[in-house]
Amino acid sequence: MEHFHQIQQTIQHYQQQLAAQQQQQVQQQQLQQHQVVVQQNQQQAHQNSSNTTAGVGTQQLFTYKMASSFPNPATTMAQVVATSNAAGTTGYDYRLNMAQAAAAAAVPGSQWWYSAANQGQVDANTAAQLQHQQQQQQQQQQQQQQQHQQQQQMQQQQQQQNVINSASPMSRVKADAKPRGRMTAYAYFVQTCREEHKKKHPDETVIFAEFSRKCAERWKTMVDKEKKRFHEMAEKDKQRYEAEMQNYVPPKGAVVGRGKKRKQIKDPNAPKRSLSAFFWFCNDERNKVKALNPEFGVGDIAKELGRKWSDVDPEVKQKYESMAERDKARYEREMTEYKTSGKIAMSAPSMQASMQAQAQKAALLAAAAQQQHQQLEEQHDDDDGDGDDDENQ
C-alpha cells in the first residue's frame, strides 16, 4: 500500500515538472514572438530610410544625366566658329556664375556635374541594402530552425506524457473519496521493516520476494510482547476505518460491496487452507510413481497420478475423502480461533503437513502449465501435421 502511494506521489511530481516545463516554453515562445515583431518593425523603418536615401540619389543622378546633354565648353566648344558675342564662342558655363577666364583656366579632367561624394553615397547605400537583406535571410533561417526544434520538443513531451498517463495507476483510482482500507498487524510490521531497511541501506535495491520471506520468518519468531504494538496500531486503524465508513456516502449509482478487492499482505500465521481428497492421494502416491518411473518428469508424474486416481477403488477413494473432510474441519476450527484471537492455534505436525501439501499443490500446478507449454511447442514444430519435426527435415 505504501509502495502504491509512493508511485502516485512520484507520478504527480513528474506531471508537475512537465507542466512547469511547458509553461516555461510557452513564455519563451511569447518572448521570441515579441522579439520577432520588434525586429520586423526595426527592419521596416530601416527599409523606409534606405528607400528615401536611394530615391534622393536617383533624383540627383537623373538631374546630372539631364545636364550631360548640355555642351561643356572645355571639351566640345574648342573648334566652334566665333559668333556675334563671347558667349557664343566659349559657350555657357553653368558652374555657379564663375568668371569666363577662371572657367577657362580651370578645365576639369572629367565631367564636373558627377559629384564623387554623391556617387560614394549611392554605392554605400547599395552595399548597406545588400547586407541588410543577407541579415534578414539569416534571421529567417534561424527562426525556422528554432520553430522546428520547438515542435520536436513538444512532440517528445507529448509522447512522454502519453506514456506516463498509460502507465499511471491514477486512472484506476476512484473519483470518490472512499476511506482507505484498514491494515493488519502484520502489514504494519512489514511496513516498519521496510522503513528500517531503507534507513540502513538507502541505495540497495529491494527484492520483494526475498524481503517478504525474511519478514515472514522474523514475524514467526517474535513473541506476543513484541507483536503487541503492531496489534495496537492495527486496532487504532480499524477504529479509524469504521468511523470513516460511518460518515462515507457512496456516489450516486455506485455499487456497494462489489468489485475487485484490494490485495493485502498475507499473514503467514493465517490457517492453511484444506486439501481435497485428490491432493491427499497425490501425497501418498507421488513417491511410488517416481520410484517406478525414474525417467518421468513433473508433467508425466501429474498425468500418471490423475490416471491412477480415476482407476482407484471406491473404498480407497472414500479413505481420502474422509481425510479431506477432517482437514476441512481443522481449517474451519483454526480459522474461527484466528478471527477471534488473531493468533494461530495449530500444532507443529499439522502446520508442517499443511505447508508440505501447499508446496506439492504448487508443484502440480507448475507441472500442468509446463505440460501445456510443451504441447504448444510440439504443435508449432509440426505445422504440416505429419508427426515429424519440420525443423529437422
UniProtKB/Swiss-Prot annotation:
One of its GO terms (molecular function) is single-stranded DNA binding. GO terms for biological process: chromatin remodeling; developmental process; leg disc development; negative regulation of antimicrobial humoral response; negative regulation of DNA-templated transcription; negative regulation of RNA polymerase II transcription preinitiation complex assembly; negative regulation of transcription by RNA polymerase II; segment specification. It comes from the Eukaryota. GO terms for cellular component: nucleoplasm; nucleus; polytene chromosome. Residues 364-374 have a biased composition (Low complexity). Its main location: nucleus. Belongs to the HMGB family. Binds preferentially single-stranded DNA and unwinds double-stranded DNA. This is High mobility group protein DSP1.
